[in-house]
Design a protein with these regions (language model features):
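Conserved core architecture of multi-subunit DNA-directed RNA polymerases
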Residues: 1-166
Length: 166
């Protein structure tokens, strides 16, 4: 029982979850109802962060200067923290500092996706509510209701349901 007590309180981090998912055999993946040739469970853990093209996150011109889009600013923060984390690992910084940077990186990536996270509503560096990907897609001004569901949209995959003329 002593040797199992340590495992009971062990933290589950993304790297450990990825390792566990990668060790699932092909037959077990099929038992989970997944097709191993099309996708495996480890595909659900991001290993690379998608960065949209500049056309999706344009600079906004103001009177004296231009400001970058929220997603561009957040990508810059993520790159900076990732660089500091890599340098800290190479230089042998204390474990607590590495853990703090790792957790801060996770928070920044979560805000990159959804800017309205509970407890993290505003970004303290910019002093305003961030518009992450979720805010750009949902709501009245979002991509779906604001652009794709309008009356004058062609090639959006919508069909018109009408009664049978016979």
């Amino acid at each position: 029982l002593e040797k199992h007590a340590k495992r009971a309180v062990d933290d589950m981090n993304p790297l450990r979850a990825l390792n566990l998912f990668q060790r699932i055999s092909t037959t077990d993946v099929e038992l989970l109802g997944m097709d191993p040739s099309r996708g495996r469970p480890e595909a659900f853990i991001w290993q690379y962060l998608p960065a949209p093209p500049v056309a999706i996150r344009p600079s906004v011109a103001q009177e004296a200067a231009s400001t970058e889009d929220d997603i561009t600013n957040k990508l810059g923060d993520i790159i900076q923290i990732n660089t500091l984390l890599s340098a800290g690992l190479k230089s042998g910084q204390p474990v607590m500092k590495i853990i703090d940077m790792w957790e801060f990186l996770q928070v920044q990536i979560a805000m990159y996706i959804d800017g309205n996270l509970p407890g993290l509503g505003r970004d303290s560096a910019y002093g305003k509510a961030l518009r992450g990907f979720c805010q750009r897609l949902k709501g009245k001004q979002g991509r779906f209701r604001g652009n794709l569901s309008g009356k004058r949209v062609d090639f959006s995959g919508r069909t018109v349901i009408s009664p049978d003329p016979n």
